[in-house]
Amino acid sequence: MKKWISLLVAAVVILALAACGKSESAKEKTNKLVVGASNVPHAEILEQAKPILKEKGIELEIVTFQDYVLPNKALADKELDANYFQHIPYLEAQMKEHGYDFVNAGGIHIEPIGVYSKKYKSLEELPNGAKIIMSNSVADHGRILSMLEEKGLIKLKDGVDKTKATVDDIVENPKNLVFEADVEAGLLPQVYKNNEGDAVLINANYALDAGLDPAKDPIAVESPENNPYVNIIAVRKGDETRKEIQTLVEVLQSKDIQDFILEKYNGAVIPATK
């Protein structure tokens, strides 16, 4: 009798170990990534990638943010595996300011910035002394000023790094444009809707999130050609070699996702690989 009890106990132990082994094996097969993103278009693009990643054994959790500060803090605090909301100059500025040890794991798309106005239908119509409202994100100032220089409204000093230019680098301003830069980027669409200022510079993601059409509503749009403001997947240094991160970037750069971006946003968002 004791012999049978011993055999029964041994069998139960073996079955339990086998079940644990299967459980551990299942855990190994499904890897989870937590990615922080802006609502539009970043989170929408990630949602499109979700089923593709699932087929590759990766469970994607998307955490959305309404500003440009918290996603990097959350990444630094290891609350996220990656974030997808910022362009390269902004990442570099944030790393310098806060000491973040991040890297660019891959570029995904470009969001051409637009000039919006309730009062005027073209840049040429802007009057002398027109008030130009832009975000308080210094990393976007060079981008905005470079666009306005390209459109012939101002001239920047020779030799200045266009991605880091400030209003102090303006050497010619024939319309005497007045620049205001004290508004959070996410609030700019409301500033435009309230008819404040003569022109408002709005990033495409915030324009889309506010129900604007970045391909039709602006009176002028930044050129996507040779544009350094590529929105990227940012990770902590060292994580760029993780298989899950590499797979995430590969999927987001795939033809399926590129085609989705082109069809969904109709030129307001452009795949970086195009």
Task: Identify the role of each PLM range.
Residues 107-117, 142-149, 208-250, 252-274:
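Periplasmic-binding protein-like
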Residues 105-154, 258:
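A conserved helix-loop-strand patch within extracytoplasmic ligand-binding domains
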Residues 76-86, 130, 153, 175-177, ...:
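Alpha-to-beta junction loops
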Residues 28-40, 58-64, 131-132:
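Short, well-ordered beta-strand elements
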Residues 39-61, 70, 74:
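Short, polar/charged alpha-helical segment
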Residues 63-73, 161-190:
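Short helix-initiation/N-cap motifs at beta->coil->alpha
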Residues 15-19:
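C-terminal motif of bacterial Sec signal peptides marking the signal peptidase cleavage site
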